[in-house]
Amino acid sequence: MLRRLLLLLVLLVGLSPTRAQAQSQPQPRRLSLSGQLRSGTEPVAGAVLALLQPADSSMLAYAITDSQGRYTLQLETALPELLLRVRSLGYRPQLRQIKAETQRLDLSLEREERLLREVLVKAQRLWAQRDTLNYLVSAYTLQQDRTIGDVLRRLPGITIEDKKVIKYQGVPINRFYIENLDLLRGRYNLATEGIKAEDVATVQVLEHHEPVRALQDQRPAQQAAINLRLKDKAKGVWSKALRLGAGAYAPGPLWDATLQASYFGKGRQQLLRYSSDNLGRDHDPAAVLYGAFVSEPTQLLELVAHGRPPVGNGLFGYRHGAHLSSLTKLADSASLSYQLHYRHQSTHGSSLTETSYLLPEGTRLQLTEDISDRTQRHATELQLSYEKNRAQSFVSSTLVLSGEWNEGRGELSSVSRRLPQAAGGTAEIGERLQALHHRTLRLNSRTRWVHRGAGGTGFEWSSTNSLSSSPQALVLEGSKLARQDLSLSTYASSNTLELLRKVETQRWTLSATAHLDARYTTLSSSLTHPDVPRGGRSELSHLHTRLALGPILRYSHGTLQGSLRLPLALGYTLLDNTPVAGERSDAQRLKLHLQPSLSLSWRLSDSYSLQAGASYSASETPWRQLLTATIMQSYRSLARYRAALHDSHAASAEARLSYRDLFSRIFAHIEAGWRRSWSDISYGTRLDEEGQRLLEAAYLPHHSERYTLTAYGRKDLDWQTTQLALSATLSRSEQELLRQGVRLHYRALGYGLQGSVGLDLTSGYRLEYDARWQGLRSELVEQRLWSGALAQRLQLSLALLNARLQAKLYAKHSHDSSLALGQRDFLFLGASLSYKPNRRLELILDGDNLSDIRSYATRRLEELEEYRSVYHLRPRSLVLSLRLTL
């Protein structure tokens, strides 16, 4: 691994000329050219200005004038002179030589009369200004679109996944602004599903976006941000919308209610939302949170619950949610915001699952479970934030208080047997009742301070602290009586100090960074279980601290940026378990690690950009895998580990090449990744004849390796407003697993293909089709398994009576070729009919699962297990809703 890192460093150094050459050549400098284009007294909008290299007329930068004819061109160059070319339809082109210096240049264009035959000039729908892409919303909006989220799904380069994650060129965004303000602080789906498409003028994608202005020259930004530019009619006014719906399905009545109010002013923004329904929606737009505090999960105990079907709707119950966001702009660069969020969800359901555990001797242990459960979940959060973002300084402070309360009860019956049958008998486990109680209270704070001096030097300091308490209990009744009580408390602090240097004036800069982290965890456990005679009470305390110091070497030349970090980390761990006879329960150690990382960003041209990185890390055994006491994690799972401190090592590398052509409207990227991990301790499972699992640790050096390759392409055509997208994935993994105390070698090859097409059949009639095919081949102890599934969706949208009457018809089909018995193909039908008599009122009739499919079967593979599940689905339903804009 060290040899590979040295090779990457040599390649990075080789991209730069020698120091003597750099001193003899002119140093590149940044210039800004701005002005206004006019023809007489009228501004010229949509004109293209390009800066060219005099030697070969190659393009260095370009810009497009706005509605007032204004433009701004920025460039870093060492040339003394440049060529400026100006072109616009209907005007005589210009080409002039200018000095390569910051200046204001107002230009006048002369009209040019040309005879054009049957030429239709449309408003420009997509244009770029440096690292900002601008999408004209009206050019991408269809008659059936209601929210800005409907339009975002159609914009080239932007995708919204099933879990509502917004991505640009396959990478999740890091900010979602509304008029350049971050009102929602990570709950960005409130905007995509709550802001009307007709209120947005332009969607901007800020490529390579660094939110902190004082750090924009320090590190290559990998993510993009989205900014919504609203129309004037939507600014400074309250926008209110109400939706009320009622309907029915076989189990009983249905309801749907949503109320939202928003205000987007110049110095103040607010959004309020309340929603409630029993339609089986598992998505809450306020629940998907970008960039949240990374807190360690506190729930150690789980209720074995019914599964969720990948196709169809298997969620029964209801939910309520309320959210309030408010932001006040104190000055041009300072803002104060707060958020209050609450959600409650009650669910119930049932499923039948058959799990086959692959065993070392080539046999299988098959566990069949009939599960039904009912859960209640409550969550609330209060967030206060202050931010001051200036060119030379940045201050941010956030305080979050959150709580969760989960209650669950379930019934299950299970049968286990050995396959082939001759290898063993059948064990009837009988009926069991399970109950889960879980509470969590968290307090998180984050402070960040960046300061830059006049010469560009400065520092960045950040501190993140968290305090949490989580009591929880799991109770089993029926054929086996058991009870597990836990009380978990954690305090964590992460602090970073980094020195900053100005990187624009020189290619190489050297700075330093320091980290001080600490985490203290205490756990109290009480277990009563017939299979664990040494249950009773037990305690754990775990302290881990880490001090890291190291240099940061940065390289910057034009559009090429890279950084090499070499932190040397000193870690100290102190572990204290309740004594166990004949075993070691306490441990402590001091360990030194070198954890280098390399990142590279290179904008090869206006169309191509490259990002790459490599890293090595070493992490110590987490406290969860140091418990010497037995913990009942679920009705079928017991965990007991050893107090052995060891390191897990990982090395990874990834590269990503992105392409975009605005004029041809082509967006594409290809990404490759590699990761290898190794450790001296293996964690595996030991199964008894009833399918009960004991999670254990053993000294067994092992490793795992994984390769991934992803490709994506998107093309838009003017013909019938056609959109084409295609993506492919390939993954290969090898790892060593522990089952029944035996090391097993596991291999897997996964692949997937996904495509979509959308086009207008005629005015008001649009057809959209997407399909996804996935396959997996695995090999274990001469057992070869294969699974494959196809899912496709077809939707026809119709707009009649000047779009006042709209209809949507859709069909979903799934095929699982790996199901040996039973039904392999399922077809789901749905429809929606809406009538809008005026701008404020809309009536909507929704029909779900019109084919009335009540059950759905799947098969999937996961390392040493094979799952076959039968899900119970919601039957046919009809809901009539009224949507009113107030």
Placement of each model-derived feature along the sequence:
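Surface-exposed extracellular loop regions of Gram-negative outer-membrane beta-barrel proteins
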Residues: 572-577, 606-652, 674-691, 851-864, ...
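Short, ordered, surface-exposed loop/turn motifs in non-cytosolic proteins
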Residues: 39-54, 79
